[in-house]
């Protein structure tokens, strides 16, 4: 089947991507060891699924409807592996500072509302009540639009995956002196028996989160991107309460 050839090609690209992510821009042997150990767990589930469904497709006399269903599973699991590799490569580049940065003046409130708004369908599906609070007057920051979008995107994906359904998610934009802070606060679906420092480490997630399809790279990438934009990201954990604060220097209105 042509589709199987495509998935075989996907697996080859995945292997190449893993090798590149591990060997390129990563000087810490400890980091490489942790990366291999933890990512192998995330790769195992979709890879096992792909192998099993390929085996089923190789059997004779498979009804077309079943074959279609198997191919859909293969496509979905291949997409998971592709996303993992993309995140690995971005994490490597972000942590090494090799990503290009184009700082420009952005209106934080408008940018925040627009980006968070892209998650309307996901938050409604997870029965999350978004509460966004921001000043009426514009607040400007210096940031890279593409990287800033990715930071918010990663945080919102994290919220959609791990927040307790039927709870409120608070997002607050405020200016404090020469600083601008954006705070994300939500209730986790399980107790966070881990320190905020450990949460910022790549691939460290609570055992309960292994039931989701995340790869644990989102927070690490967001933190590295904030540093590249001369900003700061802080995490706070208290039981099942999870809070992230993004901090930028305030940009003068000209």
Where are these regions (language model features)?
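Short alpha-helical segment of the dimerization/phosphotransfer core of two-component systems
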Residues: 76-81
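Conserved micro-motifs of the catalytic ATP-binding
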Residues: 96-101, 140-143
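Conserved catalytic submotifs in the C-terminal HATPase_c
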Residues: 102-106, 129-139
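Short helix-loop "hinge" at the ATP-lid/N-box region of the Bergerat-fold HATPase_c
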Residues: 159-160
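Short beta-strand/loop element within the Bergerat-fold HATPase_c
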Residues: 166-178
């Amino acid at each position: 089947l042509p589709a199987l050839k495509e998935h075989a090609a996907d697996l080859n690209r995945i292997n190449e991507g893993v090798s590149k992510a591990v060997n390129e821009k990563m000087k810490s042997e400890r980091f490489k060891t942790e990366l291999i150990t933890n990512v192998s767990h995330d790769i195992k589930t979709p890879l096992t699924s792909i192998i099993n469904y390929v085996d089923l497709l190789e059997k004779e006399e498979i009804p077309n409807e079943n074959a279609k269903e198997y191919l859909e599973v293969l496509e979905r699991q291949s997409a998971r592996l592709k996303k993992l590799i993309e995140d690995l490569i971005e994490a490597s580049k972000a942590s090494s500072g090799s990503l290009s940065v184009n700082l420009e003046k952005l209106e934080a409130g408008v940018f925040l509302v627009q980006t968070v708004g892209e998650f309307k369908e996901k938050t409604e599906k997870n029965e999350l009540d978004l509460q966004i609070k921001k000043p009426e007057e514009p607040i400007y920051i210096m940031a890279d639009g593409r990287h800033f979008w990715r930071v918010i995107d990663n945080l919102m994906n994290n919220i959609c995956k791990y927040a307790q359904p039927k709870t409120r998610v608070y997002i607050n934009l405020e200016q404090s002196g020469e600083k601008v802070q954006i705070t994300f606060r939500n209730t986790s679906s399980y107790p966070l028996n881990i320190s905020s420092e450990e949460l910022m480490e790549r691939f460290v997630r609570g055992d309960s989160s292994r039931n989701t399809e995340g790869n644990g790279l989102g927070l690490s990438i967001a933190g590295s991107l904030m540093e590249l934009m001369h900003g700061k990201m802080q995490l706070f954990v208290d039981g099942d309460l999870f809070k992230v604060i993004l901090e930028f220097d305030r940009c003068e209105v000209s």
